């Protein structure tokens, strides 16, 4: 199997990679039977609010959490969510950066 490098396919545009990852997560949540919407509270947007059988899951998707600004943005999206449903940040980072009750998971 030949190696394909992300930059060769997408160029240096990380936003495109984020969109591909968001699409993968969206399709997977639909496959699992969730109703999937985009959340918005104030000026912050949550990538996906997934609901099934009265349960809810909040998801943020990022390629990498490489800078403090990215970490603040992705985890900060949940700042105004006041319920206790699970909140996840998904990325390709291989080490756990969970914080403040928000779980970080590797997207693979």
List PLM regions with ranges.
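A cross-kingdom feature that marks ATP-driven nucleic-acid transaction machinery
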Residues: 1-108
């Amino acid at each position: 199997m030949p190696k394909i490098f992300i930059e060769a396919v997408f160029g240096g545009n990380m936003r495109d990679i984020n969109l591909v990852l968001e699409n993968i997560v969206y399709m997977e949540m639909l496959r699992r039977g969730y109703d999937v919407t985009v959340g918005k509270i104030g000026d912050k947007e949550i990538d996906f609010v997934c609901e099934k059988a009265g349960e809810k899951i909040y998801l943020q998707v990022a390629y990498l959490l490489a800078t403090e600004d990215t970490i603040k943005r992705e985890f900060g999206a949940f700042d105004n969510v006041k319920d206790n449903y699970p909140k996840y940040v998904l990325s390709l980072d291989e080490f756990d950066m969970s914080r403040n009750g928000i779980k970080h998971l590797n997207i693979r």
